[in-house]
């Protein structure tokens, strides 16, 4: 043995929301046959999307591309009220694969709006989840904040009737800084009853921080358009080590590992384990022979499928436990 080691982060890869979203598309294809139309990539991973496309899924952005009476699935990121209304008017058979933790944020937005609160959204402009959440209200009713610097530029109607929500896949540390800035500028701003950043995002970022303390380099398996995968790479890099994100093993470069004795490997919440295994095989082939699993939070959450797609014996759990 040469002492060169690969340490696998735990937890890593698929979260409950991603697992549910993929299963909804697969079950819809089994029940109703191809094509099944999916509004936006169901999750942000090229391997997953290509695999579903081969099975008969058709990924679209505009509902005008969907024929009357077709089966339509909303992506895990959620959709706006306008998209929901158009789908209803056109009579599609709709299955909502929105992550339940994103749906929780949508419900919070509706509750706050009913109380006449102006709402600030912490998130990345253009991300599908942000568009879906901000689209729960009429255009212009929510304010978007991406950085601490944006907080100083905010113009609000009434600082005493103000609240915020956030995208579920953000950097935990950066979001804390933005929240601190919001609370400093608007002391009466309402905070969510429960943090909006999801358990999977938090757990994976915590695990990669621990990984970065033990390793000389961290590899994150994830697609370029995956928000949570990008945040994992950034978190690792912020610890002062080399960190790279790869869609699959073919993107690895042997020179990255020269002089590195300990390699950390993790995967974004939308990246399947098969891609992790391919990355491991490649790195092992370059001389890092030992592989061990890191410790970390155990995840046992399972999100139920829509009742129309459940099989016999699949029941709705009373509670989703971590």
UniProtKB/Swiss-Prot annotation:
Q: InterPro entries annotated for this entry?
A: LytB/IspH
Q: Which residues bind dimethylallyl diphosphate?
A: 44, 77, 127, 226-228, 270
How the cofactor binds, per note? Binds 1 [4Fe-4S] cluster per subunit.
User: Is the Zinc keyword given for this protein?
Assistant: no
Functional pathway: Isoprenoid biosynthesis; dimethylallyl diphosphate biosynthesis; dimethylallyl diphosphate from (2E)-4-hydroxy-3-methylbutenyl diphosphate: step 1/1; Isoprenoid biosynthesis; isopentenyl diphosphate biosynthesis via DXP pathway; isopentenyl diphosphate from 1-deoxy-D-xylulose 5-phosphate: step 6/6
| Residue sites binding (2E)-4-hydroxy-3-methylbut-2-enyl diphosphate per the record | 44, 77, 127, 168, 226-228, 270
The GO biological-process annotations, alphabetized, read as: dimethylallyl diphosphate biosynthetic process; isopentenyl diphosphate biosynthetic process, methylerythritol 4-phosphate pathway; terpenoid biosynthetic process
- What cofactor is this protein dependent on? [4Fe-4S] cluster
Instruction: Name the CDD domains on file.
Output: lytB_ispH
Record EC number: 1.17.7.4
Origin: domain of life? Bacteria
Which Gene Ontology molecular function entries are recorded, alphabetically? 4 iron, 4 sulfur cluster binding; 4-hydroxy-3-methylbut-2-enyl diphosphate reductase activity; metal ion binding
Instruction: Name the positions where isopentenyl diphosphate binds.
Output: 44, 77, 127, 226-228, 270
Active-site residues, as the UniProt record annotates them: 129
Q: What's its catalytic activity?
A: isopentenyl diphosphate + 2 oxidized [2Fe-2S]-[ferredoxin] + H2O = (2E)-4-hydroxy-3-methylbut-2-enyl diphosphate + 2 reduced [2Fe-2S]-[ferredoxin] + 2 H(+); dimethylallyl diphosphate + 2 oxidized [2Fe-2S]-[ferredoxin] + H2O = (2E)-4-hydroxy-3-methylbut-2-enyl diphosphate + 2 reduced [2Fe-2S]-[ferredoxin] + 2 H(+)
- Record flagged with keyword Endoplasmic reticulum: no
> What are the binding positions for [4Fe-4S] cluster in this chain?
15, 99, 198
Q: Give disulfide pairs as residue numbers.
A: none
Q: What keywords does the record list, in alphabetical order?
A: 4Fe-4S, Iron, Iron-sulfur, Isoprene biosynthesis, Metal-binding, Oxidoreductase
PANTHER family, per this entry?
4-HYDROXY-3-METHYLBUT-2-ENYL DIPHOSPHATE REDUCTASE (PTHR30426:SF0)
Q: Which NCBIfam families match?
A: ispH_lytB, PRK01045.1-2, PRK01045.1-3, PRK01045.1-4
What family does the entry list? Belongs to the IspH family.
Describe its function: Catalyzes the conversion of 1-hydroxy-2-methyl-2-(E)-butenyl 4-diphosphate (HMBPP) into a mixture of isopentenyl diphosphate (IPP) and dimethylallyl diphosphate (DMAPP). Acts in the terminal step of the DOXP/MEP pathway for isoprenoid precursor biosynthesis.
> What is the recorded name of this protein?
4-hydroxy-3-methylbut-2-enyl diphosphate reductase
